[in-house]
Each structure stands twice: as C-alpha cells, then as structure tokens.
A protein has these predicted regions:
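Conserved beta-strand and immediately adjacent loop positions that scaffold enzyme active sites
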Residues: 8, 106, 177
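Aromatic-flanked redox-active Cys/Sec active sites in thiol-based oxidoreductases
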Residues: 33-39, 68
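Thiol-based oxidoreductase modules, predominantly thioredoxin-like and allied folds used
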Residues: 58-74, 83-92
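A generic "binding-loop/recognition-motif" signal
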Residues: 70, 91-92, 113, 174, ...
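Short, internal strand/loop/helix patches
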Residues: 79-108
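Glycine-rich phosphate/adenylate-binding loop and adjacent beta-alpha elements
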Residues: 169-195
Length: 195
C-alpha cells in the first residue's frame, strides 16, 4: 500500500544537494518518475516519461526522476535526460520503500503538505493518465497525451532489486546492485543487510 513519506525524509539530487522532503515541496508539488537503472522496464519508459515530465516544466510544480541508484548510475542510465529535469538519487531505496513502491517504473505525486496524492507502479497508461491529469487539474495546466504514439504497450513493472515484501512491511536484503541481487537472489549477496 502506498503512503505519504515522512516530511523529514531526505531527497538527494544527482548533484549531491540533500534536503528534507518538506524543503523540496515548500512552494511546489512534486511529480517524480521512479526508475531502477538495473531493469529493462525502466529503460522502456524513459522517452515516454520525459515527454510527460516536459509537459509540466512551465507549471508551478517540480518534475523529475527518482533513480534507485547513485549519481553515476543515474547519469549513465538517463544520459541527457538527467539534465532536463531534477534528478534525485535513492541508492538504498529508502525513499521508495517509504512510499511503498515495490516495482519500477513508477510515478508519484506529492503535494506541499507533503502528502502523497497519487502513485502507481509499472506502465499502465490509464493509471499514469489519472495521476498526471490530477496534477494538470490542480495546476490548471494542459494534460499530456497518454498513451501517445511511440509509447510502449502496458507492462507490469520489475521488482525493485533488493526489496522484499514481508507481511506488508518491506526489508532490503543485499546491496541491490551486484549481479547476484539483480538476478533476484539478494540473500546470496555478500553485503547482506536489513533495514
């Protein structure tokens, strides 16, 4: 189940600026596309997500990426897209875990409270359309076409490497980045840890 993140939870930009969530949403809503640089599913949505985010660049909201990885992984995975919008990094998946996502890609909308307004995971154009239409209505802004020509067909997201569901609670096992973790066997990772 999705839930609002703690206002004190830190979000770190790709440039290393780390601030509590409340500081990032003082004046603006936040629309983030969550991606895992170790999944094919994340790469399939980059152009579509970039088009959707571009629609809101002039609106009174912040739009960007939330990459489950470090700055180098985010820059490599997103390429020039990492410079188009604000890019946050979440190397251990702490923020993503707090929101309740277990798959990527995903999209989340957080208001100025900061409260989670909407979230979904995987690429379901109808669900993404509801989220971005809600933001467009709130911003009194135009809506991007979803789906649009060239968008991928709907698909379920990939499990976030290292996130494991446990009676509704989530634990992170393994580093989530090594080949063992990416192969879905985080329990065999040499850097096993639980948060």
């Amino acid at each position: 189940m999705y839930k609002s993140p703690n206002a004190s939870s830190n979000l770190t930009s790709i440039n290393g600026q780390s601030l509590p969530l409340r500081s990032w949403v003082t004046n603006f809503h936040l629309l983030l596309v969550v991606i895992d640089p170790f999944s094919h599913e994340g790469s399939w949505i980059i152009n579509t997500a970039s088009r959707v985010l571009s629609n809101f660049t002039g609106a009174d909201c912040r739009v960007g990426w939330l990459v489950i990885g470090d700055a180098e992984q985010a820059a490599t995975f997103l390429g020039p897209h990492s410079d188009e919008f604000i890019t946050f990094i979440d190397p251990n998946g702490d923020f993503v875990k707090e929101v309740g996502l277990t798959q990527t890609p995903g999209i989340i909308h957080i208001n100025q409270a900061p409260k989670l307004i909407a979230a979904t995971q995987g690429w379901n154009p109808e669900e993404w359309k509801v989220i971005v239409s809600g933001l467009a209505d709130h911003m009194q802004w135009s809506r991007p076409a979803i789906p649009a020509e060239g968008d991928p067909t709907p698909y379920q997201g990939s499990r976030i490497a290292g996130l494991e569901e446990n009676d509704g609670e989530f634990s992170i096992l393994g580093c989530g980045k090594c080949s063992v973790c990416r192969a879905g066997k985080p329990e065999k990772c040499e850097a096993v840890w639980v948060s």
